[in-house]
Structures are given as structure tokens and as C-alpha cells.
């Protein structure tokens, strides 16, 4: 835990964190899990199914970015830490348990669905915490400067990820979830700013022209206006093309 700010001292101004496009996607996943849990507790299979399918669509994009870019990047700077920790194998476990939920959705027995989903949820929440513990410290080793790390995120994650047919949808979904539900430690406006500002700093001008309108229409207007004024979200992407 960081030291408390002394009385009368100004808090350090926030800085853009490009790797937050991965970290705060975890918070969108956690928000989706909370919505699914509430739907199951209410016996609302329709809402549960809608939120489950949305989360799985977003998770597929996020996992592909990890499988095709993030794990190899961090293994290279962390002496194989991601592979040694079994993170890629955990993705296979996650997919196996998710298939069990998909099968249970066709079963009229709500208890069977709750059982299958609880097994997936417990594994997935553990996986998110495991990834954060292993991966987040390694991100600082990818380049010596914030600008260098932003370029790494652009080259290894944003540009390849943006080739996915669902990437634009993914950006909108993450912003929607964060701006309405926040994170486990951040209120909605902060969680949203961390993700969107990080994405802007890891995008070329052309990419940000593509992503910014998606983020804006996925965010409550008053929140977007405040963030745009405070953090220059209406200016261009920060990676030189």
C-alpha cells in the first residue's frame, strides 16, 4: 500500500498508464461477474445469459491479446515468468469451465447453471488475481520510459488487437462497464479515465480517431465531457505514426 499523503501536501497528479488497457479490462470482467451473480440470485436466466454472452465476447478479445502478445512480451523481460506461473494453461481451464456454463444454459435446472457458473467464477477470479500478481510488476521492465512503454503497448497489443473484428466492440464494452460500475477500488470516473487515457496514449492518431467515438458513446455524456476537458481526450493519439 502506498504511503499516505502528508497533511497539506498535494496528491501526485495522475499519469497515463498504457498497460491499463489490459489491467482495467479485468475490472470490466469483474463488473460483468457481479451482474451475472445478481441475475442468478434473482432467478433471471434471460439477463444472466445476456451478460454471460457479453462477457465471453469481451473475454475472447482480451485473452487473445494475452495469448498472442502479452505473455510472450512479459516472458521475455521476466525470465519466463508467465509461462512458469502457468498463466497460458489457466486460459485453457477457463475455456473448459466456460463450456460447462454454455451447456448448463440449455438445462432448465437453475441449480445446474448456478453450479457450473460458480465453478467458472471461482476459477476466473483466481486467474485474474494471479495474472495481476505476476504480470503487472513486469510491465515496468518492458521499456525504461513511459513513452517507451506506450509504444510497446501499441506495437504488441493495440495494433494486433485492433485487427480483431470484435476489438471496437470490446473497447465500447469495457468503457460501458467501467463508466457505470467502476472497479473494485476505483469509482466509475476514475476507472474509466485510467482505461481510456491509457488507450489514447497507446494509440496512433489514426487509431484514436477510430477508438475515441466508440469510447465517447459508451460513456455517460457528463462523465465524458469532464474527462475530455481534464485529460485531453479530444486531442489526438500520442504514438507517432
Report each predicted region and the residues it spans.
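Small-residue-biased structural context
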Residues: 1-241
Amino acid at each position: 500500500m502506498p504511503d499516505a499523503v502528508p497533511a497539506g501536501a498535494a496528491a501526485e497528479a495522475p499519469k497515463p498508464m498504457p498497460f491499463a488497457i489490459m489491467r482495467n479490462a479485468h475490472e470490466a470482467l469483474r463488473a460483468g461477474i457481479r451482474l451475472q451473480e445478481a441475475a442468478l440470485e434473482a432467478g433471471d436466466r434471460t439477463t444472466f445469459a445476456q451478460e454471460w454472452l457479453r462477457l465471453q465476447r469481451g473475454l475472447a478479445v482480451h485473452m487473445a491479446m494475452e495469448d498472442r502478445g502479452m505473455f510472450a512480451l512479459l516472458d521475455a523481460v521476466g525470465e519466463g515468468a508467465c509461462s512458469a506461473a502457468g498463466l497460458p494453461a489457466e486460459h485453457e481451464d477457463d475455456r473448459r469451465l466456460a463450456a460447462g456454463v454454455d451447456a448448463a444454459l440449455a438445462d432448465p435446472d437453475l441449480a445446474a447453471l448456478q453450479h457450473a457458473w460458480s465453478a467458472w467464477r471461482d476459477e476466473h477470479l483466481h486467474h485474474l488475481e494471479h495474472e495481476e500478481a505476476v504480470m503487472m510488476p513486469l510491465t515496468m521492465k518492458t521499456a525504461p520510459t513511459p513513452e517507451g512503454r506506450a509504444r510497446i503497448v501499441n506495437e504488441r497489443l493495440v495494433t494486433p488487437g485492433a485487427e480483431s473484428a470484435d476489438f471496437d466492440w470490446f473497447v465500447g464494452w469495457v468503457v460501458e462497464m467501467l463508466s457505470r460500475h467502476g472497479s473494485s477500488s476505483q469509482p466509475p470516473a476514475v476507472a474509466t479515465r485510467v482505461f481510456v487515457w491509457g488507450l489514447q496514449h497507446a494509440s496512433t492518431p489514426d487509431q484514436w480517431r477510430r477508438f475515441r467515438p466508440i469510447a465517447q458513446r459508451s460513456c455517460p455524456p457528463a462523465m465524458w465531457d469532464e474527462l475530455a476537458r481534464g485529460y485531453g481526450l479530444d486531442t489526438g493519439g500520442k504514438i507517432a505514426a
